[in-house]
Amino acid sequence: MTPDEFLSALTEFDIQLSDKQIKQFERYFELLVEWNEKINLTAITEKNEVYLKHFYDSVAPILYGLITDQPVSILDIGAGAGFPSLPMKIIFPELEVTIIDSLNKRINFLSLLTEELGLENVTLLHGRAEDFGQDSNYRATFDFVTARAVARLSVLSEFTISFLKKNGNLLSLKAAQFEEELTDAKKAIAILGGKFIKEIAYELPNGDERHIAVIEKKKETPKKYPRKAGTPAKSPIK
């Protein structure tokens, strides 16, 4: 997907990018490749692949109507190089984005990236989601939590649901279908106060399958969750 094909694909969803936004994506690509030589951000560095598998894929929640141009708050867990939240932020600057990442080098990259791209209302937090999930400054404060290929749903639910306001949504983006994961995660989602709403299946323009699971927070997450860092991955709720 060339940059021009990226723009054309967005126009099919009635999204027209300004010259400023086009340049922001271009600079994003340049910085991603430049920093990837210093720290491991992505295995995908070829320009057309970045535009398809990082930029286009990241904005799927916008393309499929899950996130609109409202000043809602989004927490991105394990965003790595800023995916999916920062491409969405470029398209809808009104979004208030917070990113949690456990690796300080990635936070340094994201700090420079957001400054270079002129992105405002972006908060970067260095640490573990399990720790911030018990912090009253962040717990039950976000409209959306996004996570792209971070963990199985049973584990991801514990990482994320505590951060959501009531009626807020977890958007889990993955290549594979969620059917098997949902069966495993059903109990965890319920215990944590969530409810599976739907799965959106779609294809990238090259035919690759992608899926978004939408989980809505229906009630308060019990205070004991998330458990201490490392525990959810080692001992998922069953």
Swiss-Prot record:
Which cellular compartments is it found in? Cytoplasm
Looking at the keywords, is Protein biosynthesis present? no
- Grouped into one coarse class, the protein's main location is cytoplasm
What Gene3D superfamilies does its record include?
Answer: Vaccinia Virus protein VP39 (3.40.50.150)
**What is the main EC category here?**
transferase
User: What superkingdom does the record give?
Assistant: Bacteria
Q: Which SUPFAM superfamilies match?
A: S-adenosyl-L-methionine-dependent methyltransferases
Q: Which UniProt keywords apply?
A: Cytoplasm, Methyltransferase, rRNA processing, S-adenosyl-L-methionine, Transferase
Q: Extract the ranges annotated as region (Disordered).
A: 217-238
Q: Which family does it belong to?
A: Belongs to the methyltransferase superfamily. RNA methyltransferase RsmG family.
Under the heading NCBIfam families, the entry gives: rsmG_gidB (TIGR00138)
The record's function comment reads: Specifically methylates the N7 position of a guanine in 16S rRNA.
* Name by which UniProt lists this protein: Ribosomal RNA small subunit methyltransferase G
